[in-house]
């Protein structure tokens, strides 16, 4: 392998690492918006034709629906949410990327606190040099009232195998 070939190979590897970092930052930015209550900024993380599936909660298609759906989170009475992401795996192929991350969340509404576990499956696309979500699918493993436990009879939701 010549020096030029080695440099070109290193540049390709570096580009993939930089793309993965930008996709990871996109996911982090989403959860920063959620956790900080900046619901009006979430739409800027999506492509024009994006779709979002939030498990049994909601589906949004297109930026207008995504914007309205997430802004609605901020207007619900006594609604609080904090999300924590783990094990973000990312693949990149040119201007397309996919990612999976695991979710732990706490939310409360009308005085009841819930524990949530699930995962996000994402499809991302580079648009005008910026990585954006084109698809975000949340799969919830369970949502349960805090103190009940995730296998108790009072669970709010438990995904069957």
Regions found by a protein language model. Name each.
Residues 39-104:
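A solvent-exposed, acidic/Ser-Thr-rich amphipathic alpha-helical stretch
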Residues 29-31, 75-78, 111:
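Short helix-to-loop capping/linker segments positioned immediately adjacent to catalytic or ligand/cofactor-binding
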Residues 98, 117-150:
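Short beta-strand edge/turn micro-motifs at domain boundaries
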Residues 149-161:
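Extended, polar beta-sheet/loop recognition surfaces of beta-rich domains
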Residues 9, 79-87, 106, 140, ...:
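C-terminal-biased regions
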Residues 83-85, 115-120:
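Short, surface-exposed coil-to-beta transition loops
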Residues 106-113:
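Short, cysteine-centered beta-strand-loop-beta hairpins and adjacent loop/turn segments enriched
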